[in-house]
């Protein structure tokens, strides 16, 4: 079992964007916190659950596409993956590693709101996504 977390704090200077009328503020901040837990059975089959929360400074021009003018988004991510080749038994050589998986992201808030975030009735859950992936390392 593995438990990971991360916090990212980002500051942007937007002097040029503000001069061009693309941002209201000359600087904004963006913060992101993520925590996830993973379990791998025999290093072959894995399940990961992640909670994420992103928030930042409002700006009426930079985030003009949503009614809250905020970048705030939060939700859960679920991932199920398998590693058929990762322990030296690959037909393509001992160093070939392959992981296949599926990932689902469930948004609670998107662009500052759970419902009608864009003023057109869109819900945060309209951005939920499913991703199928293959990861290869050699």
Per-region residue spans from a language model:
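Outer-membrane beta-barrel pore domains
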Residues: 1-138
